[in-house]
Structure formats: structure tokens, C-alpha cells
Amino acid sequence: MTKFIFVTGGVVSSIGKGIVAASLGRLLKSRDYSVSILKLDPYINIDPGTMSPFQHGEVFVTQDGAETDLDLGHYERFTDTSMSRLNSVTTGSIYQAVIMRERRGDYNGGTVQVIPHITNEIKERILSVAKETNPSVVITEIGGTVGDIESLPFLEAIRQLRKQVGRQNVLYMHVTLMPYIASAGEMKTKPTQHSVKELRSIGIQPDILVCRSDRPIPRGLKQKLSEFCDVPVECVITSQDARSIYEVPLILEGEGLAEQTLKLLQMEQRQPNLEKWQAMVQGLYSPKHTVEIAIVGKYVSLGDAYLSVVEALRHAAIATQGDLQLRWINSEDLETQAPETYLAGVDGIVVPGGFGTRGVDGKIAAIKYARDRQIPFLGLCLGMQCSVIEWARNVGGLAGANSAEFDSTTKYPVINLLPEQQDVVDLGGTMRLGVYPCHILPNTLASKLYQAEIIQERHRHRYEFNNDYRQLLLDSGYVISGTSPDGRLVEIVEYPQHPFFISCQFHPEFQSRPNTPHPLFTGFVQAAIAQSHPTANFQTPVKVS
């Protein structure tokens, strides 16, 4: 029987429920339990695919093409398990499903209500994850904060589910804040007490409290929370601020979170195997070489817009013993200032994905700077398209070359709409999404990095390289190193007369993991370190020359 763990949050938003859920998943998996993690988001959007990155952060794409919350990226990276569209549920998708049933007449003329129809649909979504993959444990994170009106149907559904599947098969975990008041010189339990009171008024008694704090919580305060919140003192867990999110599983293991979870769910206690994770964290905290990477993007005012890119760079830095320093550059600034004003001194340049014409010329300027100055460059999705435009304009002799997305009247549309996108009207969920195979050509940088002929990568785009210009770019020295298996779609391009210059149409950042960094990122960071540390000795199998 699958066990169900529900993670709620109180006191403040952005308290770190996703990291707690992902960390618990890591701890259970280290004990050889299979885990799937589900996110319930209370917003009315069907999915985050059409939401602004400035509001929502990045859109994380699963293997099966679902556009999901960035927390699913944490789930995948921490548990090293691929999630699917079943692992992401929004209020909008719940209401859409119920309303479609009502329109079909499935409710036989009955009045459709939040209880039972909406709550039943929520419960069915949770149970479907267990049915699909039959994991030992399904961890469900409920978005928002207890007390928010938007979250009430989700909380009611998980309250009902305990009776439905059996009390011994459900655990409620509440993540709260324990603030330290400097003027009083003490930590305060009252916010947590009130948050638990709010949760109990809904009918949910938490089994475990995970208390976020910037310092250790004294035993006396844990005892106080135990008495006021009716939780065993050993189930009051400190989640102290860490230097890195990857240290959190180790902190929670030291607090006994997994042990208490297994005890409450009546599961077998097993010894954890966290040696590789501990070694990874140790590597993160003991770098040998400083490496500064510029991220030239359109949404840099919100770092979460490029969360998976940053984490993939971090994974690669760990593998290459690099101390990663990021220089965030708004691509619009490069449209009015010389690139060296912002890019001078960086060891590598990443141009990530995005949509729309704003800031594109700045991205193209950054790419030209990287190519001219022999600075390692990695282009992702839109970054790949911009690299093709830059080459076509400045090397291929196609003055004014552009993407049809940015200029529908351009004389040289080197990037064009995918044929299957021609008649698409709706924006949501209609792009080329999810995993597609890619054939790697031999004797290329891509083949040296991947060490494989066929790879699988995740996509999210409507536009592609225009094959009408394939031969022209090849003749001018550009190399196409990855295509769809039928050779029709160009997926990877590179410039061989350069220390490291490669771009891909897909999003490799979505498949990078702390202990298995993505080869494109590892090769890129290694090349960037070599810029400022030519004698660096890398303990990594990646060879880029």
C-alpha cells in the first residue's frame, strides 16, 4: 500500500516547502524506498506555461511535455526521479476537468459543488500518481499558506483522504517559521502556534512540524511547541538555514525527520545511504578554482526565471571543482552599451531561453562578443536561435538575417516557425514540448561531450532553424552537430575554431542532477575554468579538446 505525506506551509509564503518535500524524498530514496512528489498549486491558470517569468519564475518541462512549477525541478534533482504531468496539479486544471464533465452531462443534472465534486477530483489526482507508478510513498506539497482562501479545497481534500485510505497510511507535515526577535533576544513560537491552530480549525492535526529558523531551536522551545501543538517533541524538526539547498537533506537527516516519518507511517526503518550526497555537498563547499559566468537574459531581475540553468551550472562547477560566481546581465543593456562594459573579465557566457523580441539584439551582441573574444559560450533554446542569427549576419553575409518570430518581413528568416505550428491559435500547451531524440554527428564537440550517438532532451519552443539556409551556414564554417533522427530538424550547432562554442535548441538544464551534471554544462564550465586557470587539473571524464 502506497503511503501519503502531505506538506503544508504556514506563517509566510516561500518558506521552503518544496525543498523540505524534495529533501524528504531524497532521504526516503536513500533508504531504498521509491518516491513520487506531487505539487498542488492554488492558482487558476491551467498550468504556468503562459505565465510571466517575472511573476512565476521558470517553467519546468517534464519528459512527457508538461509545463509545470519550478518545484518539480527540485523534486527531480533531489530524488533523481523523472516526474510527469501527473505530478503537477493546479486549481485551474481541477475546475477545467469538473466543468468539462458537467458540460458532457456526467453529473446527471446534479448541482456541481466544491464539496464533493472539486474535492473528489483533487483526491483522484493524488491517487492517480500512486496508481500510475506504484511508489512506496507519494509526497504532496500544497502550494500557498494555510489560511489562504485559495488553498481551502486542497486542504479539505487531503483531510478527507486520511479516512479514505486509512489513518496509518497518511502523514501531515507542516512547515512553519520560527523567527528570532533581535530586540528581545529570543525566538518566538507564537506564529507557529497560530498557524497550527488555523490548520486544526480545518480538521488537520499535523503529525510533524518542520520549523525554519536561522539558528538551532533549543530543546525547551521544542518542548513548548510539542505541548501547544500536540506533536511529540521528537517530531518538532529544526530546518536551519543552510549555505546551499543541497545541504538541507543532511540537516533534516540529523534532526531525525526520515526516522520519525517511517515510524509514524509504520514503515520499516532502514539505514540511509547518503555517502554520494555527502561527497557532493563537500565538493560544493571545497572548490579549487573560481569561475565567473555571465548569464545574459531577459528576465534577470528574478533569478528564479533561470533556476534550472543556475542549478545545472552549479552541478557542473561541483564536478569541475569550481567556485561558481554569476554575473547577471540584462540583455537590453547590451543594446545601448558596448558589450565589454558588462562582459569584460567573465570566463564564460550563457544565453538562455526566452520569448519575444525584447532584448534579442543584446543577446546577439553578447554572442558576437563571445565568438570574437574566444570566450566559452553556451546557447540554450532562444540562445541557439540567436547564435544562428549572429553567425548569419556577421559571418554568413546575410545582413538583416533574423527570426520570423522577431521580424516577419525579414529577407533572411534563418529561424522559422515549425510547420506543425502554422495553424496553432492557443498559446498554452501547444509548443514542441517534452523529450525528443537527437542524433549526434561524429567528430564534433557534441559527440565528445555526450559520448553517444542518440540522446534524449527536453524541448519547449515553436521556432526552429530554417533548412533553406543550412548549406550556406555550413559553407561558411558553422557545424551542425545534432539533428532529429530523420535529419530534418537542426538541434545543435557549434563553431569548431573556438575553445568552446556550442548551442542547442533544447533545454539540457532540465536533466542535470547534482551527482550527474549534464555534459554540455560540465564541458562549458570546464572550458570556462581553463580560461583563467590554464593549468587546472580536472577530475572529470569530459574532454573538450
From Swiss-Prot:
Mg(2+) binds at D71, E141. CTP binds at S13, D148, I149, E150, K188, T189, K190, P191, T192, Q193, K224. Its EC number is 6.3.4.2. GO terms for cellular component: cytosol. Pathway: Pyrimidine metabolism; CTP biosynthesis via de novo pathway; CTP from UDP: step 2/2. L-glutamine binds at G354, L382, G383, M384, Q385, E405, R462. SUPFAM superfamilies: Class I glutamine amidotransferase-like, P-loop containing nucleoside triphosphate hydrolases. Allosterically activated by GTP, when glutamine is the substrate; GTP has no effect on the reaction when ammonia is the substrate. The allosteric effector GTP functions by stabilizing the protein conformation that binds the tetrahedral intermediate(s) formed during glutamine hydrolysis. Inhibited by the product CTP, via allosteric rather than competitive inhibition. PROSITE patterns: GATASE_TYPE_1. ATP binds at S14, I15, G16, K17, G18, I19, D71. It comes from the Bacteria. InterPro entries: Class_I_gatase-like, CTP_synthase, CTP_synthase_N, GATASE, GATase1_CTP_Synthase, P-loop_NTPase. GO terms for molecular function: ATP binding; CTP synthase activity; glutaminase activity; identical protein binding; metal ion binding. It catalyses: UTP + L-glutamine + ATP + H2O = CTP + L-glutamate + ADP + phosphate + 2 H(+); L-glutamine + H2O = L-glutamate + NH4(+); UTP + NH4(+) + ATP = CTP + ADP + phosphate + 2 H(+). One of its GO terms (biological process) is pyrimidine nucleobase biosynthetic process. The keyword Metal-binding applies. UTP binds at S13, K188, T189, K190, P191, T192, Q193, K224. Residues 292-534 form the Glutamine amidotransferase type-1 domain. Belongs to the CTP synthase family. Homotetramer. NCBIfam families: PRK05380.1 (NF003792), PyrG (TIGR00337). Catalyzes the ATP-dependent amination of UTP to CTP with either L-glutamine or ammonia as the source of nitrogen. Regulates intracellular CTP levels through interactions with the four ribonucleotide triphosphates. CTPSs have evolved a hybrid strategy for distinguishing between UTP and CTP. The overlapping regions of the product feedback inhibitory and substrate sites recognize a common feature in both compounds, the triphosphate moiety. To differentiate isosteric substrate and product pyrimidine rings, an additional pocket far from the expected kinase/ligase catalytic site, specifically recognizes the cytosine and ribose portions of the product inhibitor. This is CTP synthase.
